[in-house]
């Protein structure tokens, strides 16, 4: 019997694009678990989430960057800096755009920076094709093809999975020979506490009004397992203003209870254990513009 001497391939892929183009949805579909939060609110992703796709032949580490946007505070500065710095660390780049929106100034801003990258493949990924008629898709594709010389163009639906296997296969073919950076069963390099905080924040974004989401952070105060396998989690939801605290708590605590109930289901799925989740809400005025507070919440500038 011949030995299988096929070389193992591994590498890093950055997913960049304007806010709310479906980067997190794509990542979660490929990995098969929820490692990046999903919301219809722009600027949902704040830290570079690494999702890990592994087969017996290759391993791709995806970096889901914060959406590149015009910044209005120090948190916004951090998010944009994080997105741009990721381009220096990877073997390939995916630029994701929406099929149901024309090319705009935000897309052009990113494209001008991608043009400077000549030593790595840059793929144009047109997401949400399930929302448009094929006849409407062609002009969108042409407008981006005219913008720069892409390695390849992939129309996809991250929500429905259309054309994603073909995209991942192509990415795999461009990964260099290398080691297996992470074990087969590891799907993210973030600690469980971080992912738990993100799952809670996702529910806040999904359930609260428009003025609240950009002003929310979640801090895990304690996370301990008892002898019976129950994981006790105490977490604080940080908001920017007293009015937002009232919205998150809701009348008679109804909103906070719903946030906790939905988050607990996802956390139990993540941990594979029963979870007791206790939530508080705290006001920290102007936290998004204070470097010290940002660092205490886990947004560390020197790590990016």
From Swiss-Prot:
Location of the region described as G1 in the Swiss-Prot/TrEMBL record: 17-24
One Gene Ontology cellular component: cytosol
Membrane-spanning residues: none
Region (G4): 127-130
Membrane topology summary: Peripheral membrane protein
SUPFAM superfamilies per record: P-loop containing nucleoside triphosphate hydrolases (SSF52540), Prokaryotic type KH domain (KH-domain type II) (SSF54814)
Biological processes, Gene Ontology terms: ribosomal small subunit assembly
Region (G3): 64-67
Region (G2): 43-47
Lipid biosynthesis among keywords: no
All residue ranges annotated as the Era-type G domain in the record: 9-177
Region (G5): 156-158
CDD domains: Era, KH-II_Era
Residues reported to bind GTP: 17-24, 64-68, 127-130
Domain of life: Bacteria
Main location: cytoplasm
Quaternary assembly: Monomer.
Function (record text): An essential GTPase that binds both GDP and GTP, with rapid nucleotide exchange. Plays a role in 16S rRNA processing and 30S ribosomal subunit biogenesis and possibly also in cell cycle regulation and energy metabolism.
Protein name: GTPase Era
Annotated source species: Pediococcus pentosaceus (strain ATCC 25745 / CCUG 21536 / LMG 10740 / 183-1w)
Gene: era
């Amino acid at each position: 019997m011949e030995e299988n001497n096929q070389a193992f391939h591994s590498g890093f892929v950055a997913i960049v694009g304007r806010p709310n183009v479906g980067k997190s949805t794509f990542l979660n579909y490929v990995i098969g678990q929820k490692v990046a939060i999903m919301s219809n609110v722009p600027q949902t992703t704040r830290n570079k989430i690494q999702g890990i796709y592994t087969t017996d032949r290759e391993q791709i580490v995806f970096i889901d960057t914060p959406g590149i946007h015009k910044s209005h505070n120090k948190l916004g500065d951090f998010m944009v800096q994080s997105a741009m710095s990721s381009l220096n660390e990877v073997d390939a780049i995916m630029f994701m755009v929406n099929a149901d929106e024309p090319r705009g100034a935000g897309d052009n801003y990113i494209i001008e920076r991608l043009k400077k990258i000549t030593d790595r493949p840059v793929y144009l990924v047109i997401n949400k094709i399930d929302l448009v008629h094929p006849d409407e898709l062609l002009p969108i594709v042409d407008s981006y093809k005219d913008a720069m010389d892409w390695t390849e163009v992939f129309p996809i639906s991250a929500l429905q999975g259309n054309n994603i296997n073909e995209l991942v296969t192509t990415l795999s073919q461009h990964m260099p020979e290398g080691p297996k950076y992470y074990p087969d069963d590891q799907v993210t390099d973030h600690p469980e506490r971080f992912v738990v905080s993100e799952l809670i924040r996702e529910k806040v974004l999904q359930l609260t009004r428009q003025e609240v989401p950009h002003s929310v952070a979640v801090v895990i105060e304690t996370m301990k397992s008892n002898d019976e396998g129950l994981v006790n989690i105490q977490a604080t939801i940080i908001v920017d203003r007293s009015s937002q605290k009232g919205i998150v708590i809701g009348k008679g605590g109804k909103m906070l209870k719903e946030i906790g109930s939905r988050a607990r289901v996802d956390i139990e799925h993540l941990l594979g254990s029963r979870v007791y989740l206790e939530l508080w809400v705290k006001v920290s005025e102007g936290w998004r513009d204070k470097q010290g507070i940002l660092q205490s919440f886990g947004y560390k500038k020197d790590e990016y």
